[in-house]
Structure formats: structure tokens, C-alpha cells
Amino acid sequence: MSDYESGSDIDNYYEADEFDDFIEYSDNEVEQEKSKPTPGQIEVEEIEEPEEDRIRTLTTTLKPNETQAQKLLKAHISVLVSALGGPDHTSDIQPPPYKLGHDALACLKDIKRWIRAVDEKKNNYEVALACAESGLVTNDLIVIMCQWEDKMQKKEIIKNKTTTEKTMLACLELLVLLTWPVEFGKDLSESQKLLYSEIKKVHVSYKKQILMFNNGQLLKAAIRLVLPTIAKSRIDREPRDNQILKLVLYLIRNLLAIEPANLSISNKSRKGASVTASDLPLGVTQDDISINNVLSVFKKNKVLMLLLTISGSLGTEFDRDMFGEICLESIYLIIKGLSASEVLVKKNLGSTPVAAPSQNTVPDAINASQPLQPVTTTVGMQLQDLLATESKKKKIQTQNIASRHGRFGSLLSIRSADSNSFVVSGQEALINTDSSLAKLDKSKKWKDRTYFKYDSDEYVNTSTPVYLNLTGQDILYNFVEQFLSGGCFNNLIECMGSRLTSQTDLNMVDELTLASYFFTISWFLSYQRERIGLDSENKELNYGSVGAALSEVNFILIIGYFRDSFSVKKWNSLHVAMICFKELLQISNSVFGKEITNQTGEGDEISQHEIDRELAEGIIRKLFSFNDFLSIIVQIPQTAAKHSPDYLRVSVSVVHILLKAFETFANEDVHLYIQSKRKQSKRNRKRVNNLDKSTEDRLRDVIYASDEELDQSSAKEITQERKLDFKKTEARFFHQAIVSTYINYLSRYEDLSNQEIKTCLSYFHRLFVVRKDFTGLYRLDFMQLLQKLRNYLQRGSSLRLQVEEFIYYFMKKFKTAFERFPMPIEVLFPRFEDNECKVYLATGEVYEKEETTSTSRSPRLAKDLEFVRDFGLDDQIKILVSQLHVQEKQSLLKWLIQELERIINDRILNSDSIAELNASNQQRRLFINNGYLRFLLRIIGFDLPYTMEEVPELATTVDMEHLTKVTELIKKWDSSQPVIFEDDKVPSYFVRTREAGYDEDQYNENDQEYDFNDDSIAFETEANPNSNRNHVSELDHLEELERQLSSNGSRVNSKERNGTKGKARKKSKEKKRPEPKKVRGLKRRRIPKDLLDDDDSQHVVKSAEFVHDSDDESDDEKDKAFFEREEKMRNLLNDMGGIATSEQLKEIQKVWKNLETGGNNKVASTVAKAVKEVGLFVEESDNDDEVEEESRNSAPVNEEADRTIFESGEVDTQQDLSDNTSNTSDMESETETTKRSFVEDPEEISHVQPKRKRLVISDDEEE
């Protein structure tokens, strides 16, 4: 044909930037491209640089607000469009065909360059509007592509086929650029904001022209361009082929996304938005761009089939990263603004079925017997909705007006108690008092009117309501069914889900992509759920066609999407997340609400029911896995009233479904476990036996053998899993902020359906009747709302009867509360959520906090106290009672006096009874952490407790005289407060903390005698019964053992002073002897200097019977047992860092004895001297006094000398040691060093010097 004949120069005309807008270039290429000035920029700069003559400018004909540069730009675009081609009037064909110009392809490329140079880089719409004025899309691009499609359909021969295809692709690319949807946002420039409404009208006109020209033949031409690409296998496709397919999908997406501009950009005035004539360009109606027309054109031109093909083949035949997002957005735009019920439920057009009208017949409007044709236009359906709303309001308005006097006016004067008159006009004011006051309230002008913020509906609703006629409903129903049955939905969701999970942060993904993903999931879940509900014959819950939406990946994504949207306050995204969350809950509830039809129970049906229950429980367990997610769900309804009505409706429905689900789970005995993460608190961590941190860490090394468990215990965050308590969780949804949300929602009762009103009533019924939280609804706004709702509802309706019953019960309870509180100021405000306010308003009593037993936070043991000097018993009681009064413990003293009197009475009846104090948990804590109370109890004669489970016990040795005297003194000084001491000193001045270490007077007074020749002293495993820490672990047994061993010599001397053995000693009144060296030696014992000075000195150790038993074992058995003990001891000491228990000391003693007997003389001398000087073991010789005295008089040495002696011992004895030797000597030294640190400063254990490297003195090292 001559229409497409062109020169050879056009055949060879090809540039690399044909699809440069849709091909990703590297950063260097982009910078080079930006640095090069385009011809359009040069011309514009040359035009704007010279100064224009003012007279010439004034005389030039320009449009309003149009510059000379804009006029020249439009002229240049007009020239390019004219050079592109036009109708060939020389042809005999009518209408005349379109003929391309000689440089048509170059003109198309120049126009694209102008768009890139001006519109994209300068953020403007100048070129796009110039193209619209020139009629580029309407008169050129659409005609060119449709004419090419006709020739291809008729299989006509086209010359220069390559150039023609390039021209078609250039036209397609320009169509995509000129129809790209625009959104009003902050990123728009000032010129774009001014031209926003104009460019939106241009897009609407493009949409109409594409859909209406030859019934959308342009779409068929675009699909024909992409057919060769689809026919190729994925391996054979080139990047250019993928870009062509992407262009076609973008064109489909653009047509679906084009909508008329909103009436206003404000978030406060979008209610009931409707398209007016000013929002549409001339010659365009709502039917031209409606979803019905779009679906009809798409079906006719195989567009829906193309979407099904690509969606079902993503990941296999087509790249999911390149095409998945576009397909998902196209599906989302098709279903946006529509509910699943609108697609499923067929509209009822009357009792007589109406046949589809023939295209060749016109309905007879005069014939009354012919049924009315259904309304198929968008304007007609919108008019039907308006008429229905009008009739509803008219019915409500006229139901209380008498028909006889309805046409007459009325004037009513109302006089208040303060003689003020108010005039009300109108017939409705005469009905009753409520109507009169309501009429009076309407005349008030409110200063602060509350508006809804329409800031959360962008991804859920369209700018204008969507009306679906029968044709569109049928097309969409068939498309959705094919989309589900063909597996396209599951494939699309799986591909997009894997793509989203590959992103490290969802905030980096486009917000529209995430919204379209979750909205599509929620819509198809709703569709499948309602389809199953409508199918009364098939009771099987088949969610296989939407199974990909119920996968583990989607639950992770929805929880993350929920959190991110709420944290950054993206209300549009949060609205979509709540809709998806609501659908998942409704699916779970529908499974639990299903009943088995055959009660006898067929096997298949019961097994299917169990499978469905597992599905429902799996949904709930995955949704409620984290505590922070549940907290977000509780917080969302508290502020829902500040957003759009749809957002508020979804929030209320989510709460309603959740409460219903919790009730179902409790009845079905479903157990949910929720995870909570918290930061590890060092202060609140439970200590093992109340030890300090360093000791606890060493014990953990022994308890937890693996490093993995140790790392887990020292993690910064602790994850706990606990069972979800449905009752406590349900109580969180009855917060006063959520109650206010429900009241605000119900206040719009005129716009709510009966089912939505019942939802609100069920919430209030659950709060007021079931939970009996009466004060939560004693609010004036709620009472007024109930009265208005009752008057609004039609008389005799079941809903009004329910409201009246609730009002009757409510006022009955409120009347009782009003009699108790004659001035209920609280009804004016929402109730405070603290327990004190709740209990007081409900019962009239002051709230007392319940005592809870805290096992995680045990009280800290108070330090032991003593008086600064000797006081008599009267002064002692006086000081301690006065100090407890200073601490405001008067009630504690009263209770103690009562307990002492009770104990005295019990002792009179039974003198041998052991009395205990009947204390509460709070008093038990004081027994441990209050040093003054412990001191007082110790003076009385009680055995002090050390844990919350223990109570003070009064032994039978305390006589009645002492007990009665102490009780009278406590009474005396308790009633004589305040007491003035000498020099106005406070009572705590006369009390001080007892010094740590050995107390000789206390030992001589309380401790029983030990035979220092008794060998069992060295291996005593029980702690001192009179010690102030008899509940701690074996580490404290070691400390107590050390004190007992080191004080043998002092006890001998004290016996000589106080009397002979077996004779009772009197209480010592003398002060402690000043022996600072001795006390310091008790805190830190060191190796004497003579061990360093004389290595040849030997001390005989006669404790061999404790090293090995006198049994009949053979040498092999002894060696085997020895090596087992050696390995066991080495492992224990390595794990514990040198800390040994009493059983381990036995093992150490045996090894040391082997060293002494098995080595040479030098080794035996060194071992014997170390055993004697360190003082761990008791010798059998009779010269214990000399040994103890020698150890006491020896001067300590530093740790460096300690290390030197063991190193020298290793060098000298390494060759002489047998296989029975080991590294125990150095371990024992470290044991002593650690114990000395515990004795000296148990609170500062973290400052202990690091351990030295252990010395291995065995034959293994020689090898």
C-alpha cells in the first residue's frame, strides 16, 4: 500500500533510545545523558534569553497566563504533529485513510524528546497539554494503530514492515507516556499543581477515545504487537521483547487507573463525592469511562485473557520481578471500589425475568404490559441511590407528623426555670418534648465542629462511587472465576510474596504495591468466603483456590505491614492491613461456626471438619504469635474516630470479630501461646540463692555446660512464650477510649444499617450486662445517644425493642447508682481507667491494692546491725521502737504486740510449743529487708528468716519472763512516741552496721564447742547453724568452714580464759581486744614468708588416713580410681574457675597426699609446707597450737611471690613427678585466692583480678 511507502532513509532510521524510558541504564550513562543539552533545551534557552520588546509583547495575541515561550513550544509541537501525517483526501476510500509523513518516525521520536526534556526534567505538563491541543492522541496515534490493526487482520501486505513496526512501537510508547496517571501530592511542582485539573481532564478524554474508537481496537493492536513475544520461549526472548510486553501492560494499567479529579484536595470534604460536569471534559460522560465500559472493551479485545495468561505463567514463562507488580496492580484496579457481594449476588429486578434486549429492537415505552428495562447507565444507578436515600429520609421525617395538620405551620414558646423564653417553629416540634428540644438544638451554631479526616481511604475507595450493571457484573464474575480456578491467583500471590520477602525492609517497597498486594488478598478471601456461604448445597469449606493467601509467608508479611504502617502513621496502608486482618479472622470464625450436618458422624465428614479446624487454629496462632502485635490491635480502635467513616467501620468490625473469636476459642478450648520480648534487666534478674553476680556466673558455668545456653542467658533480649488468657485480653478491648469510639460510631445511626447498629448494641451489652462494668457506660453522651436512637427507629421493629430493653436495664442500674452518689459529676466525662477510680465508683470504697507474691523480685537481705555501745534492754527497745516510728511502721508495731500477746497466751497453755509469727507477704518482706525489725526480733529471741517462705520462730529456750518484759517495753515506748534522745539525736545514731568478718564475742556466746582434735572438722559440710546466712549454697559453706578452721587456736585460748571444758560460759561483757593484724589475717590469709625463704624446711603432715582408705584394693584399682578422680576434679575446677565444694576438697586432699608420698623429698617438703600454711586441712599432731600460732605470726606475701614459688616448684620437680601428679597445686592456690576475695569484699566481686594461667605439672607436658 502507498500509505506506508517511505524512502530508504527511513528504513535505516533507528536510534538506541527507542525504549530508553523503560530500560534501566547505569548511573554513568544517565549522568552523561543529563550533561548533554537537548535540542529542545537549546531552543528554549535561546528563546528566553533575548529581551522581548514590551510593545510587541502587549500587541501579541496570547491566552491568559500564557508566556511567549509556551506559545512557541505549542507551535513547535503542532508542527511536529502536522509533519507526522494526516488524512489522505486524495484517496477514493471514505472516510479517507491516514497517511504517514516521510519523517513520521523521526517526528514521534522528537515529541518523545520534548516530553523528556520539558515535562520530566522540569516537572511540567507543558508538552503533554500541547500534544492534547494538537490532537496527537485522538487524531493521530489511535488512528495509526487501528488502521495498522485492520490491515494486519485482513492480512494485507505491508511494505517496509520493519519501519512500520518501529512506528507502531513509537506510537505505543507515546501513548503510555501521555496516559501515565498523575496524583496530587507534595512532590508536585507549583506549575504541576496549577495544571493538575487540566491534565486530569485530558487523561479522561484519552481514556474515552481509546475505549470508544472502533470498540477499543487500539487495545487489540497493542496485543498484536506483543503476540510474537508471547509465542517465544523464555530463553529465546530478548530484553527488547520484554520491554514491548511491559509497554502493553503499562497501557492497560494506565487505562484502569485514569479517574476524574476530586472535587477538593481537602481531607475534610470528601464525603459523598460525585462527579459533576465541571470535572469531566466536553463530550465525556460517566458511562464512557465507567468500569462497565472498561470491562466490556477489555473482554472484546482479549485484554482479560492476556492478564490471565501472564498472571498464570509468572515465574515460569515470564519474569516475576518485571511483570508481577504490573499484573497485580491491574487486578487491584479492576476490583477497587467494589465489594465481593456486588459481584456474587445477582441484582433482583422484579418477579418477572427480563430477557436481554436485542440490539436491533427498541423497547416500546408506550406499551405498559412490557416490563421495564433494567437501568444500565451509571447516571441511572446513581439516581436510583439518591431516590432511595430521599425516600428513606422522607419516611423518617413524616412518620411522627400527623397527616391532617402536616401542611400547617406552628410556633412554640418554651420557658425555662430561670424565666427565659425560647421560640421553636415547625410542625415536628409539637410531637413531644424530645422533638422540641431537638429542634431547639438544631438552631445552635457550634463553634468547634468535628470533621472526619478522609486520610485513610486512598487505597480502598475510588474517587467516585463505582456502579456495576448486569453486563459488567457478569463479565467480572466470569473473570474472577477463571482467575481462581486457573490457579492464576495463587501463582501471582506466591510470586509477589517471595519478591516482597526478599526485601530487607518493607518500607523500601512502593506503598501502592504493598497496598495492592494486601487489598487483593483480602478481596479474594472475602469473595471465596461469601461464595461458600451462598452455596447452600455444598457445605465443604474449600479455600484451595486462595490457598496462597493463607501461607506462612503472608502471615509474616501482614504482621510486618501492620507494624510498619502503625509506627509511621500511614493510615491508608493501615486501613488496608485491617481489612486483610478482618478477612483472615472471619475465615477462622466461619470454620468454628460450622456444624456437622450428620450427627451420627460419617468418617469423611468428621475428618474434613478436623482439617478445617486445623486451618482455623493455624490462622489464629500465626496472627496472635506476638504480644506487641496484639497491643497494636488494641490501640488502633482508640483513635479510629478521628479518621474516615470507612476506617472507623473497619476498626469497629475488627473489634467485634475479635471478641466473638475469643468467646469461641474459650468455648472450643483452643490454647494460644503468645511471645513477648523484653530487655534483660540486671536488677530484676533472679539470683541463684541470692548470690552476687560473679558467683552466679561461675555457678552457671557448671550448671550450663554448653556455650550456647550461656549465650542465651546473657542475651540482651529475652523471648518468653506464655498462654494467652482470653478473659484478660478481652478486657483490654473495653478501654474507655474504645467505648468512646463505639459511641461516636453509633452516633451516625442514620447512615448505619440495622446489622451495624446491632454490632454496637452487642458491644455495650457485653460491657454492661455480661461484664457488669456499669460505671463504664454511666456517661451523659451515651444516655442521650440511646434516647435519640430509640426515637429514630421505627415503632414495632425488633431493633427498637432491643434498644428499649437495654434502656430499661440501664436506667434501673443507673437509678441505684444515682441514689448512692446524689451528685454524679462523673457522667459528664469518660471514666478514668485506674483501679482506684473504678472501685470507688462501683462500690464507694477506697481501693486497696492486692498483695501479690513476686517470685522474680525477692527482697534484699538487710545487713546485721549492732549498737554503738552497750545499752540496757530498756534502752535497746527504746531505740529500735523509735526508729520504726521514724520509718512510719506504727501498724507493724501494733501487729507485733498482738502477736507477742498471742504467743504469751499460747505459752501459758503449752510451754513447749514453738511459736511463729502469722505474717502477710508484705510483713514477710520486712522481716528480710528491714534491718531494725530484724534487730528487734533478734533481741526478743526469734530465729530470723532469710527467704519469703520462712517466718520468724521463737524457740522454747526463751523464757516467759524475758518475753513478757520485752512485750511490755515495746508497748511502753510505742505509746510514748515521740521520744527525745540526748543532744536531739535521731535513733539511728545509736545503731551501726556490724563489721564483716569474725566476731569473737558472738562466737563465744552462741557457738558450741568443737574438739580441735576431731578430724571431721576439716570436712564439715553443714554451715554454722548460728550463721546469718544458713540458706546459701556450698560456696558459703566453704567460707564458714574456713572461719571454723582458722579460729581453732582462738577457741583454745578462750577456753583457757573462760573455764574448763564442759562448763558453761557467761556472756562476755568486755570489749573486743584490739588485734587489727588478726582481723586482717582472717579476711585475707597469705602464704608465710618462710615458705619462700627456706625451701628445704619440712613439716610433717599426719593426715594420711583422710587421703586414702585402708582397704584391700590392688595397685591397678587404686591407679584407675585415682585417674578417674583426677579427671573429674580437673574438669570441675576448670569449669568453676577455681571454686571448690567440700566434696571436691576431699579429692584435692587425696591428690596432695599422693604428691607428698609419691615424690621426692623436695616435693614432699613443699607440699607439706603449703598444706600447713594455707590451713585447709587439720593435722593429727599434738602441736596444733604451735602451728596455729606460727601461721598467725607469719607475715603475708604478695601474689607475685605466690606465683614464683609454684613456678619454681614446677621446674625443680617436673622430672621427678610420676604419673600420679597433676596440676592441682596451682588450682588449689587459685581456690584460696578466690575464697579470700569472697571473704574480703563479697559486694565487689566483679573487681577480682583475672585468673593466672594454670601450670601443668604432669608427664603430659613432657611429651
Swiss-Prot record:
Family per record: Belongs to the timeless family.
Ranges annotated as biased composition (Basic residues): 1060-1071
Region named Disordered: 1042-1098, 1178-1263
Composition-biased stretches (Polar residues): 1211-1226
Record localization: Nucleus
Role: Forms a fork protection complex (FPC) with CSM3 and which is required for chromosome segregation during meiosis and DNA damage repair. FPC coordinates leading and lagging strand synthesis and moves with the replication fork. FPC stabilizes replication forks in a configuration that is recognized by replication checkpoint sensors.
Biological process annotations from GO: DNA damage response; DNA repair; DNA replication checkpoint signaling; meiotic cell cycle; replication fork arrest
Entry protein name: Topoisomerase 1-associated factor 1
Gene that this polypeptide is encoded by: YBL053
Domain of life: Eukaryota
GO cellular component: replication fork protection complex
